[in-house]
């Protein structure tokens, strides 16, 4: 039986185009369309689609409000379409907060090399989230603007500053059932995390649980368009105790700071342990992903060797496998997110099947495991 899809967009051209692409895949069938969020909510309840594709900017009711309504009453996997603008990025992140599982730029040809690849990309994204009802969440409360209040920003800044002071009070790092995990005893100088589909929510779950005194730098590689990463880094920074920033060329790595690879570029490490810096380069057109997990992991292996704690989280494809292989050859630690907690079990499966990862962990316990491993729990 074909996967039933509801297409939601106020543009008749885009509804027709998306419907044609979806219907050209035999496993998918567009059962209806909706022209605004209110109509989408009604048809989601009545038609019970397996997947919804949803525009963000629509009359009557916008896509974010529609996602919240649908998740509260008739949860279904939702793929968002958004514009490649800063405001579009922020709105997309709001939609993911509300419960949408994945997103694509509305001009999805912009992240594909040709039309055939663009068609396949959309079809694969719909197929990948179709069976993921277990990941559907109750909607988050509407996010006020600005994301973080001045008082909250001040509080976070003071806490971060205290952590770098010899007199700073160490915050509580207690985690539930930490005794189930045992630290390996290895010493680390870098944490590296790579992810794709489902990554924004996964990274938020992990990073918000890390204390301000996390002992070494963190590099994050999330497949994301160029205009999205700054907004994503800003959002994470407003929610986390650690500092999170979009990486810039020449950044010196500092403990307790997470550096998010900028979209459309490659992030590499240069220098030596204790004095390492980031290099942000174009990387050429031969790479399938920009940023690419393999590129960052490979450079981390050369600089930090066995002093890297690395993780591959939910994502489509196999990016990260070869970089993780280089890390393993250097003696580093590689973990993978387990299948049950992945939105798409592609990237973690690739490292697990290759025998590269040493532990497969549920998303809810990765931060706990990290804290045990680095000696903070």
Swiss-Prot record:
Subcellular location: Cytoplasm
Domain observations: Contains a C-terminal catalytic domain, and an N-terminal region which modulates catalytic activity.
Misc note: In V.cholerae cheB2 is a pseudogene.
Protein name: Protein-glutamate methylesterase/protein-glutamine glutaminase 1
Keywords: Chemotaxis, Cytoplasm, Hydrolase, Phosphoprotein
Gene, per the UniProt record: cheB1
Presence of keyword Ribosomal protein: no
Source species of the chain: Vibrio cholerae serotype O1 (strain ATCC 39315 / El Tor Inaba N16961)
Modified-residue entries (4-aspartylphosphate), positions: 55
Compositionally biased spans, kind Low complexity: 146-157
GO MF, one annotated term: protein-glutamine glutaminase activity
Primary localisation category: cytoplasm
Domain CheB-type methylesterase: 184-377
Pfam families registered for this protein in UniProt: CheB_methylest, Response_reg
Functional note: Involved in chemotaxis. Part of a chemotaxis signal transduction system that modulates chemotaxis in response to various stimuli. Catalyzes the demethylation of specific methylglutamate residues introduced into the chemoreceptors (methyl-accepting chemotaxis proteins or MCP) by CheR. Also mediates the irreversible deamidation of specific glutamine residues to glutamic acid.
Enzyme Commission numbers on file: 3.1.1.61, 3.5.1.44
Disordered, as annotated region: 138-170
Active site: 196, 223, 319
CDD domains: CheB_Rec (cd16432), REC_CheB-like (cd17541)
SMART domains from the UniProt entry: REC (SM00448)
Coiled coil: none
